[in-house]
């Protein structure tokens, strides 16, 4: 909108006339007619801008130039330091006026205005610091580090400066630091602490002090360690010590946006990486809400005390509430989700929506409100270059703000503001809703608080516990344990709220006694990590979901107790949504390849695997997907992990020993991994292959290895990484006994020796195993060669009499040695009509028919093999359908046993009997009477 003089409200006409008359007096020529509408609007919007044009009349032509280009920065003469304040201030006021001009002409939107104000502050900081550093170097010398390289002051920008969102007339929150101690080498030497403190103070004065030319930027140094009482500049080591010992919750919010903005930016950004664990805790951290409640309470008290109810920053529904809301969610989850570690608010808001932590419609509403409030804030400050966030009380100022923003009057603007503030208040209140305390403690709460001295088994029996005496004793033991006794007052208060709620939830579960036992086991594991108590205290839905899961799954109870980070999954909206596909899981796993520290990368990969497999378990437990889908997903996840680990191992080998020029390496998955039917906790059957070109005798690195040793070392690294114990457990147990010649054979086989072995020496059972084998990682061309070897091996003509005899003999031996069935229960895997009978039937069909039916060589998983063998007429169609149902039934029951930590020995229900009968009948019809 460009306000024409004819559109100007009569009440504003005198103000505009006076402003334009002042400007006309200093201009060498009359005001161009084409600029009158814009200058009219400028006069309405900003006394500061008009004052600047009056003092710097040549600026008007620069602003009116096409595109409104930047004003060149001044050159500060090191011989004339007395001129620096005026030069910096005049440039800053000119560039600030340019920001207003670009806003009014529509060249910049709100976000660009905020970014422009930030860039201007940084430019002023760097301009001033560069000049001062030259002065200090001449007077005091420089301070070199241990390598003789001169050190620089590091200037951290916090708050909106760090986030690149500085409002028009904002102060700048700065913290000064320097890499290490020492003494300057000039004629008047200073110790590092004094040197950089003086430099920082001079910098603040050069920018902050008000002169006849105004000021550049108000500087606030109070966010430094120990606040106003602390040293002005600290070494990185002193900063580390402070945050390890003294860092408080509110400082996590302050440093979330921190950025090195001047001085040695590279060193500053590197140090900020070391601060990340302080800001973003490794685990889900609902304790961040405690700090937020304290800060919000302090601000609310200040608003009331100073009567700042019209403050659009600190008041209800204001800018600060949007910032707090986003930052709290970032702090809660940023340790687990790197995408949330974002300084810029709008980008963080988008990331929170993408992560499912803010609903898309709420995210859009918050974005709209934020931009509205920031635009209004800028216009309040543009009026007189004042650091204000309070709506004006003066009627003329109100009208100027409203008209400048395109509203007909103040009341319409105020109504629009109220709508946005209400949106923000609603979202913020939902995040910080006070916990609903019980009006009066109930019987179970009173019982818990009486422990360990008290005892009330009858109450527990009445509540629904079958073994009430045992439950009473377990709770008393827990209450008098060192873990509970050593809790802080705040953590004990959380436990006193959480445990009665857990007891209530346990009594409503199908198995109260099992639920209680598992609840106490979990609490024992998390007592020292108060962030998990905070999660259960702050999130009643997670608490109820937790007890439900604990009651139904011993396996998940164990995993939650061992790896409490999985509690996050109970709150993640993705846990009840669709699982990522194979490509999505690979992408999640391969994010760790960007992590430089191998130990951290491996822990992160373990955490990713735990989280994804937990989601699969939840989907299975809830009945949202069957075991056939879950076991396929588990195999795809394992493959993604193997691909990632191979990349890590190869990078390590390349760094240490170089590459084998032209060499190829691949990993083959056998068993349930190859057959896409992996269970929870299953090991991985792997075979390693390599192919080395003729004439290459060694790797090309600084410490060369001959090819055989190089590939063996690579395979060993893969196995070591997969089996390494981290804080998040180990990835997988590995079994490599299916390689040629088993335990006696080489760990890594050449393609040629593998081909020869399969052709000349492999047993029938090894060819059966090859039916499910597939390449899972490594060189694509070698994997293609493996497929060709596999096809040639499986597709050759066979003596069916010998084949059937070998299969029957092997199955009989396995049945004798491995079947654990008894009169009342069936071994789902090894029993008569069980999963292995079905696998042997399908493998025999492939070996018997694939010479004439090449399509049988493609499938690896059981459902696809059944379909392919039906097409090849090895199985009648009705038999194939019956086998699909039988397979799904046995897999569902088996996975249910695994999830509840029961052996896969199931009572023979009608469904199981029907499944086993179908498999047995199919085997007999195929002349494979395994029973």
UniProtKB/Swiss-Prot annotation:
Gene Ontology cellular component annotations, sorted alphabetically: cytosol
PANTHER family in alphabetical order: BIFUNCTIONAL GLUTAMINE SYNTHETASE ADENYLYLTRANSFERASE_ADENYLYL-REMOVING ENZYME, GLUTAMINE SYNTHETASE ADENYLYLTRANSFERASE
Natural source organism: Stenotrophomonas maltophilia (strain R551-3)
Region (Adenylyl transferase), start-end ranges: 441-931
Family statement drawn from the similarity comment of this UniProt entry: Belongs to the GlnE family.
Pfam families recorded: GlnD_UR_UTase, GlnE
Full protein name: Bifunctional glutamine synthetase adenylyltransferase/adenylyl-removing enzyme
Recorded catalytic activity of this chain's protein: [glutamine synthetase]-O(4)-(5'-adenylyl)-L-tyrosine + phosphate = [glutamine synthetase]-L-tyrosine + ADP; [glutamine synthetase]-L-tyrosine + ATP = [glutamine synthetase]-O(4)-(5'-adenylyl)-L-tyrosine + diphosphate
Catalytic activity, EC: 2.7.7.89, 2.7.7.42
GO molecular function: [glutamate-ammonia-ligase] adenylyltransferase activity; [glutamine synthetase]-adenylyl-L-tyrosine phosphorylase activity; ATP binding; magnesium ion binding
Taxonomic path: Bacteria, Pseudomonadati, Pseudomonadota, Gammaproteobacteria, Lysobacterales
A single GO BP: regulation of glutamine family amino acid metabolic process
InterPro entries on file: GlnE, GlnE_rpt_dom, NT_sf, PII_UdlTrfase/GS_AdlTrfase
